[in-house]
Amino acid sequence: GLPRPGDVSLAHRGVLFLDEAPEFSAGVLDCLRQPLESGVVTIDRVGGRASYPAAFQLVLAANPCPCGKAGGRGLECTCTSLQRRRYFSRLSGPLLDRVDIQVEVGAVSAADLASTGHGESSVEVARRVLRARRAAERRLAGTPWRLNAEVPGSYLRGPDGGLSAPLSRRLMTALERGDLSLRGVDRVLRLAWTLADLE
């Protein structure tokens, strides 16, 4: 029959969280590239072809190695360097080029868990996000976009994107040296606008 929506399209306008991402096959992970780029997933089957909306935030989580003990406090990792390389090689460069923020999180100790320090409440974070979205909407008024994630790179890099000449030169130098891909330049600009909106 006709292809039916899967997790990617069910995550439309939400978050697709892949825990232990390197445990997924490289083929499955690379299939995420097209919907991340276009916001649409197209499925071809013998019974027909179907396209579904798939504009989602992708969150990937991974252990530091296959056994999960590398970098841990008092834990002995049993993985070889080759095993670690193979483990992370499933997360291809083109896929990671579509991941805006990458963060390494260290092991949590018992003392960290027992700590009574308080961060921001969910309500406070929600208020900050709402203010940032309103700032983006004001800045993007008169354009077809409401969110920084929706703005195409050509606009971000163009005269209306608000990019100063010195910053533009720095980004183009990073692009020419191979430190950033064109997607990476756009990612930096989107993230910069988001951080500015959060201020």
Model-inferred region functions:
Residues 23:
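ABC ATPase nucleotide-binding domain "signature" loop
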Residues 13, 19-20, 31:
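Walker B catalytic acidic pair
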Residues 1-16, 49:
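Conserved alpha-helical scaffold flanking the Walker A/P-loop in AAA+ ATPase domains
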Residues 2, 26-199:
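Basic, amphipathic alpha-helical bundle interface domains used for macromolecular binding and assembly
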